[in-house]
């Protein structure tokens, strides 16, 4: 889908009603006769500690999923029996108008959001009481610790603080066309920003210049929020997976790993590129880069509905082992290396994660207690459904803190040639990350940022 296509999709309203119906269906899979209301609250305005400025606002994702509303201090009710939704927005505060202008009106909110009715927040408890009295056998479905003290469910026979969150987490895994368009837009803006980063390589003298270049392009193209703090890691710092200092000088460094993604109306992009600061990969850097690129390309190629993500992650390790054997860092039998889990010294993280309103989106069913170190940090376990969006982000890293115990352990050290390894420490780490939409018969790569060696070197050099 080209840019014009996703822009056309985004002219419509965020499809919150269809999301609500999907969530109700999921609740009824576990509670067949579920009736009553879904109740959600937005994030509330909160001041910084010892300050009269508000904290940076980040909307609750569960609330946004059923409303498409990015305002603070709001409430939402969905009446299961009538399939009608009500959004509650704050009334006019004359003091606030002086500083911030008029807030959204009821009529404007009805035009903007996919809801059946809009009321003022002052009407919330009366509306709850009316709905509870109209159906005494009903249940109020809400999320634990996300109900304000002044809100009452007295007229409802039951309260359930588990089912709603669980249902939304499952529902969010499969994206509809509008949600995919949001992620496409986030990728589109992020691609522009990543290209600006590549173009900065020949003149930059500090990591922070890459962060600045990325942020400037995103904001200029309408994405004022980042999906996460950008990572601009040069040299050996690239072996730190979530390095966010972004303050080191570039002198004497071979490569830069840029992991950054814009957010578009609460939907994330998550893209990583690694490139040579000189415009030309060193011999060792290119060897590692080509291994990681093969890992990514081969793993993406097998993706489609129903594929077991554990198997794709395992494939990445097999390709990494083959590659590291070919350049001499690893030695011995590849099956024994895999069985011993020695490759985890160089690829310690999972191959990817679901992507959506959160960078590490819901529904992955990770098992961080897994005794198998190869799978412990795999954020998605199970089969991939059509409509899910997942990152594919293999990497090879040379982190002394992680690798040193392997060199001291005879189970692993027999598979590692430390003399060859010593040539690669300055490579730091290489990661390549794209955002992939799973389809019934295959996949679509939503990320268009260049990653082939020749493309990368040309963009940096020019």
Curated annotation (Swiss-Prot):
Its cofactor is Mn(2+). It comes from the Eukaryota. One of its GO terms (molecular function) is manganese ion binding. GO terms for biological process: proteolysis. It is an enzyme of class 3 (hydrolase). It holds the Pfam family AMP_N. Binds 2 manganese ions per subunit. Its EC number is 3.4.11.9. Keywords: Aminopeptidase, Hydrolase, Manganese, Metal-binding, Metalloprotease, Protease. The keyword Hydrolase applies. Mn(2+) 1 binds at residues 270, 393, 433. InterPro entries: Aminopep_P_N, Creatin/AminoP/Spt16_N, Creatinase/aminopeptidase-like, Pept_M24, X-Pro_dipept-like. SUPFAM superfamilies: Creatinase/aminopeptidase, Creatinase/prolidase N-terminal domain. It catalyses: Release of any N-terminal amino acid, including proline, that is linked to proline, even from a dipeptide or tripeptide. Disulfide bonds: none annotated. Mn(2+) 2 binds at residues 259, 270, 433. Belongs to the peptidase M24B family. Catalyzes the removal of a penultimate prolyl residue from the N-termini of peptides. This is Probable Xaa-Pro aminopeptidase NECHADRAFT_60613. It comes from Fusarium vanettenii (strain ATCC MYA-4622 / CBS 123669 / FGSC 9596 / NRRL 45880 / 77-13-4) (Fusarium solani subsp. pisi).
């Amino acid at each position: 889908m080209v840019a014009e296509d996703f822009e056309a999709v985004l002219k419509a309203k965020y499809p919150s009603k269809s999301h609500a119906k999907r969530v109700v269906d999921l609740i009824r899979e576990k509670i067949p006769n579920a009736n009553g209301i879904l109740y959600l609250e937005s994030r509330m305005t909160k001041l910084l500690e010892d300050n009269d400025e508000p904290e940076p606002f980040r909307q609750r994702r569960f609330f946004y999923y059923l409303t498409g509303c990015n305002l603070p201090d709001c409430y939402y009710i969905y009446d299961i029996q009538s399939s009608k939704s009500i959004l509650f927005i704050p009334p006019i505060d004359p003091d606030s108008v002086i500083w911030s202008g008029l807030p959204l009106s009821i009529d404007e909110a009805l035009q903007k959001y996919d809801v059946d009715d809009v009321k003022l927040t002052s009407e919330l408890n009366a509306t709850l009481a009316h709905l509870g009295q109209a159906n005494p056998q009903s249940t109020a479905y809400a999320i634990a610790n996300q109900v304000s003290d002044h809100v009452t469910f007295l007229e409802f026979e039951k309260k359930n603080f588990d089912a709603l969150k669980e249902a939304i987490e499952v529902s969010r895994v499969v994206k509809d066309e509008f949600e995919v368009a949001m992620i496409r837009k986030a990728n589109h803006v992020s691609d522009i920003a990543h290209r600006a980063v590549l173009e900065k390589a020949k003149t930059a003298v500090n990591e922070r210049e890459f962060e600045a270049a990325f942020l400037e392009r995103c904001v200029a193209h309408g994405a004022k929020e980042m999906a996460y703090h950008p990572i601009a890691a040069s040299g050996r710092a690239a072996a730190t997976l979530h390095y966010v200092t972004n303050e080191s000088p570039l002198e004497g460094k071979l490569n830069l790993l840029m992991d950054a993604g814009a957010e578009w109306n609460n939907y994330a992009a998550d893209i990583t590129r690694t490139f040579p600061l000189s415009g030309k990969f060193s011999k060792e850097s290119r060897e590692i880069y080509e291994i990681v690129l093969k890992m990514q390309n081969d793993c993406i190629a097998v993706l489609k509905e129903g594929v077991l993500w554990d198997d794709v992650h395992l494939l990445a390790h097999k390709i990494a082992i083959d590659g590291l054997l070919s350049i001499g860092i690893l030695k011995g039998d590849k099956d024994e290396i895999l069985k011993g889990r020695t490759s985890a010294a160089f690829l310690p993280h999972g191959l990817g994660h679901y992507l959506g309103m959160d960078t590490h989106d819901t529904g992955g069913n990770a098992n961080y207690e897994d005794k198998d170190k190869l799978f412990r940090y795999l954020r998605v376990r199970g089969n991939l459904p059509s409509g899910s969006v997942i990152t594919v982000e293999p990497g090879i890293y040379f982190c002394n803190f992680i690798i040193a115990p392997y060199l001291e352990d005879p189970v692993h050290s027999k598979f590692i040639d430390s003399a060859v390894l010593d040539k690669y420490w300055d490579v730091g780490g290489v990661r390549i990350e794209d955002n992939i939409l799973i389809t019934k018969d295959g996949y679509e790569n939503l990320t268009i940022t260049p990653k082939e060696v020749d493309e990368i070197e040309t963009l940096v050099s020019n």
